[in-house]
Curated annotation (Swiss-Prot):
<dbReference type="InterPro" id="IPR036900">
    <property type="entry name" value="A-D-PHexomutase_C_sf"/>
</dbReference>
<dbReference type="GO" id="GO:0005975">
    <property type="term" value="P:carbohydrate metabolic process"/>
</dbReference>
<dbReference type="GO" id="GO:0000287">
    <property type="term" value="F:magnesium ion binding"/>
</dbReference>
<feature type="binding site">
    <location>
        <position position="281"/>
    </location>
    <ligand>
        <name>Mg(2+)</name>
    </ligand>
</feature>
<dbReference type="GO" id="GO:0009252">
    <property type="term" value="P:peptidoglycan biosynthetic process"/>
</dbReference>
<dbReference type="Pfam" id="PF02878">
    <property type="entry name" value="PGM_PMM_I"/>
</dbReference>
<feature type="binding site">
    <location>
        <position position="279"/>
    </location>
    <ligand>
        <name>Mg(2+)</name>
    </ligand>
</feature>
<keyword id="KW-0479">Metal-binding</keyword>
<dbReference type="GO" id="GO:0005829">
    <property type="term" value="C:cytosol"/>
</dbReference>
<comment type="function">
    <text>Catalyzes the conversion of glucosamine-6-phosphate to glucosamine-1-phosphate.</text>
</comment>
<dbReference type="InterPro" id="IPR016055">
    <property type="entry name" value="A-D-PHexomutase_a/b/a-I/II/III"/>
</dbReference>
<dbReference type="GO" id="GO:0006048">
    <property type="term" value="P:UDP-N-acetylglucosamine biosynthetic process"/>
</dbReference>
<dbReference type="InterPro" id="IPR005846">
    <property type="entry name" value="A-D-PHexomutase_a/b/a-III"/>
</dbReference>
<dbReference type="InterPro" id="IPR005845">
    <property type="entry name" value="A-D-PHexomutase_a/b/a-II"/>
</dbReference>
<dbReference type="Pfam" id="PF02879">
    <property type="entry name" value="PGM_PMM_II"/>
</dbReference>
<dbReference type="Pfam" id="PF00408">
    <property type="entry name" value="PGM_PMM_IV"/>
</dbReference>
<feature type="binding site" description="via phosphate group">
    <location>
        <position position="139"/>
    </location>
    <ligand>
        <name>Mg(2+)</name>
    </ligand>
</feature>
Length: 490
């Protein structure tokens, strides 16, 4: 008797697979559930993410690997490898091996990189023969969380349509059975990470070096350990490293891009020119200037965009950012003759808008920066090297560049923990919260902004208020947080 999985494999192997045809095969082969999935969508703004042992498990990773393999093969129409990497979390080995088992059960070859940044997976996927890439990481989340990010053959985040196909297969929960003739193989390809490191330095070869610069790097006990310090040193910088070891118990704990305090102190203590803080998978970065002042993604986009504009290299003087971008950034960029397009929060939305509009530069306030000249995913190391080179070429300090850029509107962001997933994702149905938002928007008019949204990566509702002064921002933030806590997080 031919198993359901074998029938699906044969359908894809035959080379006649189409999206509609695959859906028909999936629907005709559904079986009783083997894993428990939430009623709400599994994919968030940055892949699949959750607490290990609750949402994420080895059986789920196995299923995700298999269905990702089936969908990727159905759209590629041929057998090519999948590139797989991971961060330093204790659970990453388990999830990576389970996911690799699923991919090989789908008949695909796996090239395993081991510990590496997320943009390393994206880059190697885009320049190799790979059919796609997968990264095991929960980015800036705490050690007990983990996640699965899937990339297409171009190195960009997988489209929502393909994510939906994978989730459709997952919700069928077919038992995974395979046979020797259909299995793929798992190969260790750790040497490829060096190719990514060389690619990072390539834009500045024989043009710019960082000699004479002192740089502090906070590696957050994560995926950039070792690699980032070596790349900066090879570019000529004097490097001081913080949290530069792979530590699954401490990744992101009071360090990295969400906790700049130690980096700020170290930059001032060592009289460094600038500092960079990466998150756990190094797809984002925030900077610190010589005075210890934080430099977020808005400033990085402005400085990088202005440099490109002055070189006549920025198409339509366009930058893509999100609804979180500060009004001060937007107004200053407009005064420079530039245009800013806002998207929903999430680099996948920034990526989609960049593709749609032909924009070269985009990103998020949180430090995800995308430049289509180099690829279509956020790259913390590449962004850090660009900012450092801009400072070196300018002949002035990062502090002076920031002083000359723009003044931000006071902006407060508060996170309210809402454990109930359904209540969190459907918060818009809460009338008291909507009424409070309407009242605040009416009171501030066009001198402020309010953004309330469910996080796509954490069990929280984010409340952001931007106002003409700090007192107004603080007042309305407190009012809205109180309503969310009372009605959504009792």
């Amino acid at each position: 008797m031919v198993s359901s999985i074998t029938r699906i494999q044969n359908y894809v192997i035959d080379g006649a697979a189409t999206s509609d045809g695959l859906a028909t095969v999936l629907e005709s082969n559904f079986a009783p559930s083997l894993i428990s999935l939430p009623a709400t969508p599994l994919f968030g703004t940055d892949g699949i993410r959750g607490k290990v042992g609750e949402l994420l498990s080895a059986p789920l990773a196995l299923q995700i690997g298999f269905w990702a393999g089936v969908v990727l093969r159905s759209h590629a129409g041929q057998l090519r490898p999948v590139i797989l990497g991971q961060d330093s979390r204790n659970s990453s080995d388990m999830l990576a091996m389970a996911l690799s088992a699923g991919l090989t059960a789908a008949g695909l070859e796996v090239w395993y990189l081991g510990l590496c940044p997320t943009p390393c997976v994206a880059y190697l996927t885009s320049v190799s023969e790979a059919i796609g890439g997968v990264m095991i990481s929960a980015s800036h989340n705490p050690p007990e969380d983990n996640g699965i990010k899937i990339f297409g053959a171009n190195g960009g985040k997988l489209s929502q349509a393909l994510q939906a196909e994978i989730e459709k297969g997952l919700r069928g929960n077919l038992p995974i059975t395979s046979n020797v003739s259909n299995c793929g193989r798992h190969y260790s390809r750790r040497e490829l990470v060096k190719d990514y490191g060389e690619a990072l330095k390539r834009p500045w070869q024989n043009k710019v070096n960082l000699q004479g610069m002192k740089v502090v790097l906070d590696l957050a006990w994560g995926a950039a350990v070792g690699l980032a310090p070596s790349v900066f040193a090879e570019m000529g910088a004097e490097v001081i490293s913080l949290h530069n070891a792979a530590d699954g118990d401490r990744i992101n704990v009071n360090c990295g891009s969400t906790h700049l305090e130690m980096l700020q102190a170290a930059v001032q203590e060592h009289n460094a020119d600038l500092g960079f803080a990466f998150d756990g998978d190094a797809d984002r970065v925030l900077a610190v200037d010589p005075t210890g002042r934080p430099v977020n993604g808005d400033y990085i986009l402005y400085l990088w965009g202005l440099h490109l504009k002055q070189q006549n290299q920025l198409p339509d003087n366009l930058i893509v950012s999100t609804v979180m971008a500060n009004l001060g950034f937007e107004k200053a960029w407009q005064q420079q003759g530039g245009k800013l397009i806002r998207t929903a929060v999430g680099d996948q939305y920034v990526q989609a808008e960049m593709i749609k509009t032909g924009a070269m530069l985009g990103g998020e306030q949180s430090g995800h920066i995308l430049c289509s000249h180099y690829g279509m995913t956020g790259d913390g190391l590449l962004t850090a090297l660009h900012l450092a080179s801009l400072v070196k070429q300018s002949g002035v300090s990062l502090a002076e560049l920031i002083d000359q850029s723009f003044q931000t509107y006071p902006q407060l962001l508060r996170n309210v923990r809402v454990v109930d997933r359904d209540r969190r994702l459907n918060w818009q149905n809460c009338t008291p919260v909507q009424q409070a938002i309407a009242l605040a928007e009416k009171a501030m008019g066009d001198t402020g902004r309010i953004l309330v949204r469910a996080s796509g990566t954490e069990p929280v509702i984010r409340v952001m208020v931007e106002a003409a002064n700090a007192e107004l921002a603080n007042y309305w933030t407190n009012e809205l947080v109180a309503q969310v806590q009372q009605h959504l997080a009792p």
